[in-house]
């Protein structure tokens, strides 16, 4: 009989705020605590600040809108872009597919965040420094 494979389960609680950590130890934040639409999203050292905290708001069918605690705005694909390297920024909540994200669990208990529109992962690229 084949051994059973244990798969990690990730539970997301709506109304709870999370930090989104990159593999390099940085966290996803709104740059310069900017509250404007189009404000840059960047990686920075974790300061446990509200602009580094995110609420995963269920949008149905395992899809989420990711809302910043400080600004109340959503993680959004710039211009609804779907190609590699598309910039991610914040924008007011809208019924836009550019604001829909899927959380995919990995076997080690972590998750990957993927754009439901583009099918591409939220990825810092080669970034290792703040900014």
Which residue ranges define each predicted feature?
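Extracellular glycan-recognition/adhesion modules and their associated mucin-like linkers
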Residues: 2-35, 53-82, 100-129
């Amino acid at each position: 009989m084949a051994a059973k494979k244990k798969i990690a389960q990730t539970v997301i609680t709506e109304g709870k705020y999370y930090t989104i950590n990159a593999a390099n130890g940085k966290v996803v934040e709104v740059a310069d605590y900017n509250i404007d639409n189009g404000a840059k999203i960047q990686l920075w050292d974790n300061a446990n600040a509200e602009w580094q905290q995110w609420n995963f708001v269920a949008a149905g069918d395992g899809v989420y809108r990711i809302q910043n605690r400080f600004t109340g705005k959503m993680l959004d694909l710039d211009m609804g872009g779907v190609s590699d390297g598309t910039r991610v920024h914040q924008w007011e909540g809208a019924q836009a597919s550019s604001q829909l994200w899927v959380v995919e669990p990995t076997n080690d208990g972590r998750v990957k965040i993927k754009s439901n529109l583009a099918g591409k992962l939220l990825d810092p690229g080669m970034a290792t420094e703040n900014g």
